[in-house]
Amino acid sequence: MKTKTRRLLSLLNFCVLTLLACGNSDGAGEDSGVPYLAKKGEPVDGVRIGWDYGTIRQLATRGGYPRSIRLQDNTVVAVYENYDTGYEMRCSTDEGSTWGDPVILFPIHSITNDKGTARINIANSEIIQLANGDLLAACNYRPQTPEITPFAIAVRRSTDNGVTWSDPQIIYEAEPRFSDGCWEPSFLQLPNGEVQVYFANEGPYTHSNEQEISMMTSVDNGKTWGGYKTVCFRAGSRDGMPVSKVVGDEIVCVIEDCGFVTFKPYTVRTKLSDNWSSPVLADSPNRAMALGEPVEDWIYMGAPYLGVLPTGETLLSYQVDDIRHDDQLGDRLPYSTMEVAIGDKNARNFVRCTRPFPVPAGKHAVWPSVAVWDANTIAALATSNYQGGTEAPFFMKGHVMRDLEVNSSDIVNYPIFIGHTGICNLRLGVGKDADNLYITCKVKDGELYSGGQGTQKGSGVFIYLDTKNECLKEPAEGVYKVWCSYKGDITVWQGNKGKWENSELEGLQITPSVVPGGYELAFTIPLNRSFNKDTMRLCATLSTKTYTETLVHSNADWSCTWMKMNLGGH
């Protein structure tokens, strides 16, 4: 028996060794005779957001619920709740680097009537500039003592760019108790000039815990307001926190839908021509999950906000808690952070999520919003305690990046941005002519450091090129990686059957220069005959003394995730 067993084991070992000698399981081994086929992936094309750590600013000592807009004169405005004073507004004329003194638009105050005295707290700051230049500001009046005065939506107007304001005008009142209040106003102006205010409303449901989204209309730029209509309602639930935008020929309203285990961002929509003629109920085809990928029920996603880029793509911000806790149905706010997703030009399929603020475990960034300042600049705003124990409104800029259109050898713009991890950042621009590709990197790095020649560590940049636009999920022929330190130390690799191997890039020239606050690298890359003359893919990694950071949504080994470069051919 033992002899037979040994013979059987010997036979099995022989078979295994024979199989191994014949090559790997996919038949792509060197000796298999089968050509190597690199793994391909889906290209990551379109909009990316590069958050700028160096632009983080705290807007007040204590407070929250920040929102922002850019005015027609290019001034940037931020509004927020100050927990000590009320609703404040600050302005910036240098793109958010510095902010003027705060102006109180809605002060915390008291109301006394025959039922008693109640302190009126101010919440849910919002602001809009209308097409005619007027400013409208809105907030939520929240009486601290019940049964004295109603919860309400209040509005003020300015016709001189915020220098002076009308007296507060209460446009809607709910009930005088927290369980039957109204909340979270937000503005929208339609192409025909009609101004709308959306808000969450418990007023119609005093005998249940239900809530709807209501909307009121002004046809005279906010001077007077009509009655409200119901935008959406899920029976037995609480649609909340509405923000609406015009998207194509539709009005799209993003809400937190509470009809699940935990909140989720949903969209409800109507044609502009229909303008909410009937409510969007739970089973309506006009109600849909906003995110483009499935989300598990236990993950909390609340407080959504919607933005639309001038080029049509859409942005969705919300607060998310995706960490398991002992009490999954308890208060999720202490664990939540801000997230931003990118949607298509129909405000659907929001994907490519990023988290702007550096929030550690045990801290939070909540009640967020995303503001579109222009085609290339957005702002993330949130209430956070990430710098200490006190909640405060914070602001951070983001750079909107798109597929590159390269048609000239002159590099005048630097659209690629890397700088989310820390104070160092990289701005990268590309040019080309009939013979060469030109890449210039401008790096802000206040502590230049060299790990030594040949180490590829310290202050420097990795550049990645998929010269054939193969969109691969591994390094392969025609895909290059180039390292250059701030001193000009250079290493080149080329992909080979799933690995990086030391190589050369014929004719490559790199000119380094140290400048105040950092350094610059100028790459000249000859356009080899094997290169795709119309389209390539590009990626970069910024290296510093203490960390590295790769272009957002990119994997340094997967060229399918790199940014598309349209070169226009020859």
Segments from the language model and where they lie:
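Bacterial N-terminal signal peptides that target proteins for export
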Residues: 2-12
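C-terminal motif of bacterial Sec signal peptides marking the signal peptidase cleavage site
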Residues: 19-21
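Acidic/polar low-complexity flexible segments
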Residues: 405-409, 416, 455-491, 529-570
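Short, well-ordered beta-strand segments enriched in hydrophobic/aromatic residues
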Residues: 436-445, 519-525
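Short amphipathic, basic-aromatic surface patches that mediate peripheral association
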Residues: 444-452
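Glycine-aromatic-enriched beta-strand/loop faces of beta-sandwich-type recognition domains
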Residues: 476-516
